[in-house]
Amino acid sequence: GRQRHMFKRHRRERADTAKKSRGLFSPMKIIEAVEGALTLPFDEGMALERKLFLQCIDSPQRAGLIHAFFAEREVLKAPETKAAKPRALESAGIVGGGTMGAGIAVAMLDAGLPVTMIERDDTQLARGRANVEKVYDGLIAKGRMTPEAKAAVMARFSGSTSYDALANVDIVVEAVFEEMGVKKAVFAELDRVCKRGAVLATNTSYLDIDEIAESISRPQDVVGLHFFSPANIMKLLEIVVPAKVSADVVATGFELAKKLKKVPVRAGVCDGFIGNRILAVYRQAADHMMEDGASPYEIDAAVRNFGYPMGPFQVSDLAGGDIGWATRKRKAATRDPEARYVQVADRICERGWFGQKTQRGYYLYPEGARTGVPDPEVLAIIDAERVRAGIKPRAFTEEEIMRRYMAAMINEGANVVLQRIALRPLDVDVTFLYGYGFPRHRGGPMKYADTVGLPKVLADIREFAKEDPIFWKPSPLLVELVERGADFASLNQSE
């Protein structure tokens, strides 16, 4: 009876491990080795263990994990961190107490910094404080923090409706509404009150940081610090380097990342920096496949089976579809009229379905559920859009879905490296490992491209270009590497 109970529990743990490891096979090999220890004679058990060990050593997963390990250390090397020492970092200010501002405040408080939050009025300030406290209350509820520890942390938090409260802080992070006019108004106030030498950072995702910097009298102090939501949990911090910023300000960004236990990646100024710029492209590839015949649920499943925790349509529902909708409206005037534009997301947003927060998006979230269920009405919207666009739907296998999804990601990754938005391919890899849930055992999109082979990726892109030459334009860097017989790894040497 005891043995039967043991095996039952073992089966349960095996299933649990398989689910948690998301395609990483080494945890299952460990279980197999333990099974061997329980059921085989010693010599056979040792032989099995050796065989399993060699399977792990020879696998591309080992190479992916080792690449990830070294890449996350290599990203700390940037021209500015070599050229300059960071400025002092003893106190911080945050402008904006929404989800992002509060998350950044928690990250700063957890690092031991005193934090001053600025909001428009007392009501918004109270809401900002409540957003900060909610994080700690959640930890108390889980038994991971005591009320006394929370009180000690909150003693370092203060709020004000007057910018004058930021007169002496070493660094300010602006986390207000994503609109240029609003950002410039905030920076005009910071320019007026902050001490000389204070680092003035913006958390914008898409706006031109050079334009923000140019609008004040000290552009040399302005830097982008792009946190990922929830900012107190997500490890990635994109440090965005505008044209006029001084090297010690960039070095201070790296120093802040270290204090906050985050992984910094240096990025150049462009629409979306490294991560969101590439995301916009592979997300379009997903939309094209959806309109061509794959359901959003099939695409999400393929992406999860590749090793991601969530698929792109689940992510959209989690983040809120209204954000992407606003971005698309902002860009509508400058969109290439020849380029393909899938309207499914707009149809869904027009109905007020923004994802989890409205209980409907691509998925249905009954009674505020965290996990969505497929929605037949969404499939009907997609069908109607196919008819409108004159598209005859076809089936996609998981392999076909991932070939397109990854080719789009890799190709735009190559453009980002070519244009020096990312210093090296490994900076793209680290961005995706820490900000976008890319499976660690695959090393990152550029490492994955090397594993598959760049000639194969380029051949895929050229094949897809036959049906859509505007979307599928091979990156000149990818073409050049294939012609030279080189790979992305050859560009990872530090300068």
Enumerate the language-model features and the residues they cover.
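Positively charged, low-complexity/disordered segments
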Residues: G1-M6
